[in-house]
Amino acid sequence: MIEIPDLDYHNREYVDHLPISWDELDQDCNKLAEQITASGFVPDYIVGITRGGLTPAVILSQILKVPMYTLKVSLRDGAEEDCDHNCWMPEDAIGYGKMGCLEDTPANILIVDDINDSGTTIAWIKQDWPGACLPNHAYWNEVWHKNVKFATLVDNTSSNEQVDYAARVIDKSKKDIWIDFPWER
């Protein structure tokens, strides 16, 4: 993982923003793929969180040669009603969905987003998926970070949730940095 260097507080151009170029995005996705491969985790498919997770999810899908699906999670400004609630991804996670119905085994799912900032998106998924289908299934205690893993381009270590793979690490409790992803310009 890349530690983001201390920024010069006297240089106002870079105090609050860290721009990431398309080339750096490609390098970061390759780093994530290397981490995933080195860990031995082989995803059956990738879930790209809209909107920020779509670009890295597509790139990782190509590198790892696995299919990609999308999940709309928009939690900014309390807009939880703007989220996809589905059953087949949660059912896959515990072995009853699309992938698991033939073998009755849990699917390996890699959830990809641009940044783990506060942890709200990951927390929402961890709450929504068990609630969507089979909420009392005993396997939910074993799903997270085992066969359902999280990857982000940037991980804020002071977040309330943890990711399994990150290309860059920041700590917003020490220095508040806004990441400028190339698709945001």
Located regions from the model:
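PRPP-associated nucleotide enzymes
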Residues: M1-R185
